[in-house]
């Protein structure tokens, strides 16, 4: 082991200290959250050492010292892959989590189980680190399932609320569907490559098989909330705001995209798979951007913006630019975590009010929070020289100059414009105008835990994109030459979105109330997806099951075959018996006459 590998293992090992602390008496003290926050900050500074060594030397490493188990001919070891993706992502995730932990100390200060909440957040981070650094599919699957179960526990943190329990169940069930794809892909690789090591899979799988990649796409669709398996993401807003910030910035939702980036050596030679990923991403980014336009819950708007950005990352992988998608993951983490923390500050100060229509004029009451919210929204829209610009602008330029599906490109450009629209809508309703909240609310943001945590991410939202993009290793992007109008496409589309949003907001401010249009209903009801998936299908299934059990099983077996058949037989027998009037001589005589006539006829014939 050299300095490069040992310092990274040290920084990851430091994260387990607070988990071990939970076995001691420190876990019950009020200082436990402070210890967790401090240790994560130390882990971040330690992780900078191997990252800087890697940027300087460019040497990747694989740690494979610990043999785990052998199943027939498959040898499983604890493998850590220290490449470009894991080395850049680790300090980003640690930095963002450090800020979120400090924010949580302010946001969750009155929660009786705050120490357990911090332990859960930390385990969420640890499982994501396992996923990022894994070099075999089994280890990656442990991290994959780990982020899934921790998201379930954290989304359903306020388990006394029915909505929180439903949201947690939604998250775990939709991810279960994705996990089926992951397990099928693992089984396929085991049967065909006889290995779960990533290098061996890439070397042996030269047939360009679509089946395992479809499994991985299903897994990524579930985890990264792509169209079809997306409803759990807005529902996850029922969890506490720090959970939303961590979930959407650097942990669970980017795990699906990260999985596809890990397997890009297989995807880059498979054009069918690239087209599928491109179309899935384009549909997701447009649909969720449309859904964000008419939401009134500030957290749900930001959640849909996450889903839209994840769709943009899928589009980037679809045009065969995994390094660009990874760059967008890293830059997106800073301003998305900050946007959630700003919304958490507003919600907390307005006595848990999340409706943007009941805010307004917050620039005077919460100057620092609203300034950060404005910077975060501008970074999200790709404003030049903020963090989002360095990845988003490159993605749009690369898509414009690629041989790609024109419809997918058009949908992506429209979604980029809509990003500016819903970002402007948040700012217009919450920051500008007259206050529409209660005048008796005591608003105070002068808490160092709140200010310092947002301040760090604010600096990251301004400078991180520049720093990370300076240290990108050579990748597959060609030297792009394009006309000026193509170069300015991303900026023009964003400006169009801003102008459109402001014009619509100003035009509709003094209009009389009218009945919502069908397009508004479609967007507001999330494309009727939850109603169809969560109401229509379960109620139809329940009704059919009820009919099947009561009409078929109960009536047929319980009534017609056993009890009812006996009673019917007895009833018909009694009717037959009771119909006899007792005229036995007449019956015998008629029988005898019939017999004699029959015999005479036979004899006559003979």
Swiss-Prot record:
Membrane topology designation: Multi-pass membrane protein
Gene Ontology biological-process entries: electron transport coupled proton transport; mitochondrial electron transport, NADH to ubiquinone; mitochondrial respiratory chain complex I assembly
Cellular localisation: Mitochondrion inner membrane
EC number(s) on file: 7.1.1.2
A GO term for molecular function: NADH dehydrogenase (ubiquinone) activity
Top-rank EC class of the record's enzyme: translocase
Key words of the record: Electron transport, Membrane, Mitochondrion, Mitochondrion inner membrane, NAD, Respiratory chain, Translocase, Transmembrane, Transmembrane helix, Transport, Ubiquinone
Pfam families noted in UniProt: NADH5_C, Proton_antipo_M, Proton_antipo_N
InterPro entries in UniProt: NADH_DH_su5_C, NADHpl_OxRdtase_5_subgr, ND/Mrp_TM, NU5C-like, Proton_antipo_N
Reactions the enzyme catalyzes: a ubiquinone + NADH + 5 H(+)(in) = a ubiquinol + NAD(+) + 4 H(+)(out)
Family recorded in the similarity comment: Belongs to the complex I subunit 5 family.
Subunit comment: Core subunit of respiratory chain NADH dehydrogenase (Complex I) which is composed of 45 different subunits.
Function of the protein: Core subunit of the mitochondrial membrane respiratory chain NADH dehydrogenase (Complex I) which catalyzes electron transfer from NADH through the respiratory chain, using ubiquinone as an electron acceptor. Essential for the catalytic activity and assembly of complex I.
Protein name per UniProt: NADH-ubiquinone oxidoreductase chain 5
The organism's taxonomic lineage, starting at the top: Eukaryota, Metazoa, Chordata, Craniata, Vertebrata
Gene: MT-ND5
């Amino acid at each position: 082991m050299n300095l490069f590998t040992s310092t990274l293992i040290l920084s990851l090992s430091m994260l387990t200290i607070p988990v071990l602390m939970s076995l001691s008496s420190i876990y019950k003290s009020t200082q436990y959250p402070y210890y967790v926050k401090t240790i994560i900050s130390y882990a971040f500074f330690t992780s900078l050492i191997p990252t800087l060594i890697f940027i300087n030397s460019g040497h990747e490493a694989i740690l494979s010292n610990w043999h785990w188990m052998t199943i027939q001919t498959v040898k499983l070891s604890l493998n850590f892959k220290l490449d470009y993706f894991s080395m850049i992502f680790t300090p980003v995730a640690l930095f963002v989590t450090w800020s979120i932990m400090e924010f949580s100390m302010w946001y969750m200060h009155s929660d009786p189980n705050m120490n357990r909440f911090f332990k859960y957040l930390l385990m969420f981070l640890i499982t994501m680190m396992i996923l990022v650094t894994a070099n075999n599919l089994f280890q990656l699957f442990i991290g994959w399932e780990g982020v899934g179960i921790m998201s379930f526990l954290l989304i359903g943190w306020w388990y006394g609320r029915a909505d929180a329990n439903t949201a947690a169940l939604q998250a775990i069930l939709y991810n279960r569907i994705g996990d089926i794809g992951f397990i099928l892909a693992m089984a396929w690789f085991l049967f065909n490559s006889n290995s779960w090591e990533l290098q061996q899979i890439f070397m042996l799988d030269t047939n360009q098989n679509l089946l395992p990649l479809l499994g991985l796409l299903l897994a990524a669709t579930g985890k990264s909330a792509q169209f079809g398996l997306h409803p759990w993401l807005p529902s996850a807003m029922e969890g506490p705001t720090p959970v939303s910030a961590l979930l959407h910035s650097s942990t669970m939702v980017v795990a699906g995209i990260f999985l596809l980036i890990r397997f890009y050596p297989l995807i880059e030679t498979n054009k069918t798979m690239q087209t599928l990923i491109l179309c899935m991403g384009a549909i997701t980014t447009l649909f969720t951007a449309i859904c964000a336009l008419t939401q009134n819950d500030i957290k749900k708007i930001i959640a849909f913006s996450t889903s839209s950005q994840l769709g943009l990352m899928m589009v980037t992988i679809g045009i065969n630019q995994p390094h660009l998608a990874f760059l967008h993951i890293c830059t997106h983490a800073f301003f998305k975590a900050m946007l959630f923390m700003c919304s958490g500050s507003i919600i907390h100060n307005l006595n848990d009010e999340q409706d943007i229509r009941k805010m307004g004029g917050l620039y005077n009451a919460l100057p620092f929070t609203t300034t950060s919210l404005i910077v975060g929204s501008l970074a999200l829209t790709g404003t030049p020289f903020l963090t989002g610009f360095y990845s988003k602008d490159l993605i749009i330029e690369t898509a414009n100059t690629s041989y790609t599906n024109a419809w997918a490109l058009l949908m992506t450009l429209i979604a980029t414009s809509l990003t500016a629209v819903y970002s402007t809508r948040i700012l217009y309703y919450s920051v500008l105008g007259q206050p529409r909240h209660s005048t008796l609310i005591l608003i105070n943001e002068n808490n160092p835990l709140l200010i310092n945590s947002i301040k760090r991410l604010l600096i990251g939202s301004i400078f991180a994109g520049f720093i990370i993009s300076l240290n990108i290793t050579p990748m597959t992007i060609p030297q792009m030459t394009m006309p000026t109008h193509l170069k300015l496409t991303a900026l023009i589309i964003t400006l169009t979105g801003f102008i459109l949003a402001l014009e619509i907001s100003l035009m509709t401010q003094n209009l009389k109330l009218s009945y919502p249009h069908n397009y508004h209903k479609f967007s507001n009801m999330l494309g009727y997806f939850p109603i169809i998936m969560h109401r229509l299908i379960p109620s139809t299934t329940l009704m059919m099951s009820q009919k099947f059990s009561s009409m078929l099983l109960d009536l047929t077996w319980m009534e017609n075959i056993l009890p009812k058949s006996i009673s019917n037989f007895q009833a018909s027998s009694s009717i037959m018996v009771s119909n006899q009037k007792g005229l036995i001589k007449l019956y015998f005589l008629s029988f005898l006459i019939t017999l004699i006539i029959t015999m005479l006829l036979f004899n006559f014939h003979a």
